[in-house]
Amino acid sequence: MGHKLKLRLLDDKFVISKMPQFAELPSVFAKGEMCFVMRTDEDLTIISPEFMAPNNVQQEIGFRCLRTDSEMPMNSVGIVDSLIQSLSTAGIGVSVVSTYNIVYLFLSEEHLVKATQALQHAGHEFVHEE
């Protein structure tokens, strides 16, 4: 039986930006807002709220973010799979980023309602800010 998780929809809309491998990281990313930065041997990828997105770079726009609402140990088994299976079955693509103990799912805003329904149907629960 899969994990049943509590999820939260973040308010911001997100952009996934691709920059050259050795590009300088724009200074806006030192300001403390949530963002994800990954430099590889191929590129520099940044996932950020729209208002922080760098200009004049390759981008995918219109993403929303769902996150797990509670911390999970790094060695938890099946957490991501329990989320991805529901979305995959519904035909929804997703990009997953994990921090030390939180999972973030980035999906196209046009699929947000369908994704929410699929995750709820699988037994996951959505919580809201108080």
Q: Where on the chain are the PLM-derived regions?
A:
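A structural feature that tracks compact, well-ordered secondary-structure segments
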Residues: 76-110
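Non-transmembrane, interaction-prone segments in cytosolic or luminal domains
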Residues: 7-8, 109-113
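Acidic/glycine-rich phosphate/pyrophosphate-binding loops and surrounding catalytic core
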Residues: 106, 114, 120
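Regulatory modules associated with amino-acid/nitrogen control
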Residues: 1-86, 90, 117-130
